[in-house]
Amino acid sequence: MLTYLWVAIGGALGSMARYWMAGAVAAITGAEFPWGTILINILGSFVIGVVAALSGPDSRVPVPGDIRAFIMVGICGGYTTFSAFSLQTLELARGREWLQAGGNIVLSVVLCLIAVWLGYRLGAVLGNPERQS
């Protein structure tokens, strides 16, 4: 049960960090292109990769499961879900599961784009029933 608390705390910290970082990058680069989101996803992927490599079953660094969950699921999950996607794709590729790795990339991008489009349309309809697109 304590692990859930660590994940929740990490998620809150990751979410606050994401909000701050996105705003800071937008203040520098402008809001025309999502540089903040790209940077956040890259950093989150980097962090989850480092922690996975340092604390995985083949590592010599003893990291308790609560701390691993706090960082990987909590902080990285709150900061970006792209980090988990990236790690899973890397693990497939490292296992020479090229078709699955490619499928994960294509399906994730395409399905997430469809989902955000559908969600956007639903939000537009709920927010303004006369607006259909």
Regions found by a protein language model. Give the residues of each.
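Membrane-interface helix-loop junctions in multi-pass transporters/channels
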Residues: 1-133
